[in-house]
Regions:
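Conserved alpha/beta-hydrolase "nucleophile elbow" surrounding the catalytic nucleophile
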Residues: 95, 99-104, 217
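Conserved HGGG/HGGXW glycine-rich cap/lid loop of the alpha/beta-hydrolase fold
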Residues: 8-70
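Short beta-strand/loop motif that positions the catalytic acidic residue
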Residues: 208, 214-216, 220
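Conserved alpha/beta-hydrolase catalytic His-Asp/Glu region
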Residues: 132-135, 151-199, 203-204
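Conserved alpha/beta-hydrolase "acid-adjacent" motif
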Residues: 221-227
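Conserved acidic catalytic loop of the alpha/beta-hydrolase fold
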Residues: 78-96
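Active-site acidic short loop of glycosyltransferases
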Residues: 23-25, 88-94, 209-210, 237
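Flexible "cap/lid" loop of the alpha/beta hydrolase fold
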Residues: 105-108, 112, 118-148, 188
Length: 240
């Protein structure tokens, strides 16, 4: 059963959009990357349920956006505190957590500061501390966001993320779509991008005690493959 559901939490820290789908006994929490600053999970329950339908029998899946109104200079650790509050509100005492890119940075802090919440952890294409590659990417995206260049951000992200064939497809798609999906404000994106550039959980990784899988790519042009290796070396018993 897909059981897609769109929801919004009214927390002490502010409102937060989330989606839920699946009917399994196990709970999986998914945390998207910095693109959440451009488009949240609001209204995406059915598309996510269809995309990840293989999970819906074993898991009840939750995907959380960052809260709607972000404070200036919020850190990934602050965002992990918001996530903990959201899980508390939904009575999710313990879950498997999958964090992708910036979502992986938030997941690291959740596992460090609230280990009772995290049963198992998957960290995909993410990092534990800044490096020159991610600083350069974020600087480019920040400059584009400041001048409202939504299409530029999407194309640059695609060119750093995909094979040449996929890049050609992305160029064609964004050429046709133009500014479809462009947010009214880039403020959330800028705050999230800054939090990626300042994220540093490296020295705390050894405090993560749950079973952990790190997924990375040797040709990663955003966070680098070395970043995944660094994480795996620091977390006890981690698999890469």
């Amino acid at each position: 059963m897909l059981n897609p559901n769109n929801g919004r939490l009214h927390l002490a820290c502010g409102d937060m959009d989330y989606i839920r789908f699946g009917s399994g006994k196990r709970v999986l929490v998914m945390l998207p990357g910095v693109g959440d600053g451009l488009k949240t999970v609001k209204g995406m329950a059915l598309p996510f349920a269809l995309l990840y339908r293989r999970l819906t029998g074993e898991f009840t899946v939750y995907a959380f956006s960052r809260r709607v109104e972000l404070s200036p200079h919020m850190s990934t650790r602050d965002m992990a505190e918001d996530l903990n509050a959201a899980m508390e509100a939904l009575d999710l005492s313990r879950a498997a957590v999958l964090g992708v890119s910036q979502g992986g940075m938030i997941a690291q802090w959740l596992a460090v500061d609230h280990p009772e919440r995290v049963d198992k952890l998957v960290l995909a294409v993410t990092l534990s501390r800044p490096n020159d590659t991610v600083r350069e990417a974020i600087a480019v995206w920040t400059e584009m966001a400041q001048r409202g260049d939504y299409r530029g951000i999407m194309l640059d992200t695609a060119e750093r993320s995909y094979s040449e064939k996929r890049i050609r497809q992305a160029r064609a798609a964004y050429g046709l779509l133009g500014n479809v999906g462009k947010p009214q404000s880039f403020e959330r994106f800028l705050i999230q991008a800054e939090s990626c550039a300042t994220h540093d959980c490296y020295d705390a990784l050894e405090r993560i005690s749950c079973p952990t899988l790190v997924i990375g790519g040797t040709d990663d042009r955003i966070v680098t493959g070395k970043a995944s290796e660094e994480i795996a070396e620091k977390i006890p018993g981690c698999k890469l």
